[in-house]
């Protein structure tokens, strides 16, 4: 008998970190909640990272997910922005890991492929597919929608991830 698995998907960002919670049982997906954690751009970097940490910790405490998935970041031309995004991503991985969750990582094109079938889709396509896959879905903004897509990607790939880990030793 299968158990329901609760997954938190996290779309890291220094200004806004999106989060989405879904329940999965076999192939079925059920929307639970979504939102964003924001940091105050007028504060210093350490304080902003603390805001992200505290906000995500509250999400994990409230919804008690079983597993976590975080989107991998890309390197862009602005090295400082890339480093700051990497620090926010570190918080996004640390919070669920400290709560004892297994944290998986997915490239943006893998997330899009899992949700819309191709690796290079548009935001509106993701929004539309979220509504098809989970008719009761609610999200405010792209960050929360992306986080839900990350959670769905993990739901579709969690079995293959376990197989890879088992084969790796």
Swiss-Prot record:
Family membership noted in the UniProt record: Belongs to the RuvC family.
A Gene Ontology biological process term: DNA recombination
Cofactor(s) listed: Mg(2+)
The protein's enzyme class: hydrolase
Lineage, highest ranks first: Bacteria, Pseudomonadati, Pseudomonadota, Alphaproteobacteria, Hyphomicrobiales
Keyword Chaperone: no
Matches recorded under HAMAP family: RuvC
Binding locations of Mg(2+) 1: 11, 143
Protein name, entry field: Crossover junction endodeoxyribonuclease RuvC
NCBIfam families reported in the protein's UniProt record: ruvC (TIGR00228)
List of catalytic residues: 11, 71, 143
Pfam families, alphabetized: RuvC
Keywords assigned: Cytoplasm, DNA damage, DNA recombination, DNA repair, DNA-binding, Endonuclease, Hydrolase, Magnesium, Metal-binding, Nuclease
Quaternary structure (record): Homodimer which binds Holliday junction (HJ) DNA. The HJ becomes 2-fold symmetrical on binding to RuvC with unstacked arms; it has a different conformation from HJ DNA in complex with RuvA. In the full resolvosome a probable DNA-RuvA(4)-RuvB(12)-RuvC(2) complex forms which resolves the HJ.
Enzyme Commission identifier(s): 3.1.21.10
Keyword Nucleus: no
Catalytic activity: Endonucleolytic cleavage at a junction such as a reciprocal single-stranded crossover between two homologous DNA duplexes (Holliday junction)
Cofactor note: Binds 2 Mg(2+) ion per subunit.
Binding-site residues, Mg(2+) 2: 71
Organism: Rhizobium leguminosarum bv. trifolii (strain WSM2304)
Primary subcellular site in the record, as a coarse category: cytoplasm
GO CC list: cytoplasm; Holliday junction resolvase complex
């Amino acid at each position: 008998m299968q158990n329901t698995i609760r997954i938190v998907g996290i779309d890291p960002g220094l200004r806004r970190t999106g989060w989405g919670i879904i329940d999965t049982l076999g192939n079925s997906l059920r929307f639970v909640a979504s939102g964003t954690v924001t940091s105050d751009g007028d504060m210093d970097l350490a304080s902003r990272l603390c805001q992200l940490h505290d906000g995500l910790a509250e999400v994990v405490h409230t919804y008690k997910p079983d597993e976590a998935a975080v989107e991998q970041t890309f390197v862009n031309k602005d090295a400082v922005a890339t480093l700051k995004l990497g620090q926010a991503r570190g918080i996004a991985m640390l919070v669920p890991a400290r709560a004892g969750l297994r944290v998986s990582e997915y490239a943006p094109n893998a997330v899009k492929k899992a949700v819309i079938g191709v690796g290079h889709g548009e935001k509106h396509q993701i929004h539309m597919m979220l509504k098809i896959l989970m008719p009761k879905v609610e999200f405010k903004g792209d960050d929360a929608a992306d986080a839900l897509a990350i959670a769905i990607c993990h739901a579709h790939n969690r079995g293959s991830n376990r197989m890879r880990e088992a084969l790796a030793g």
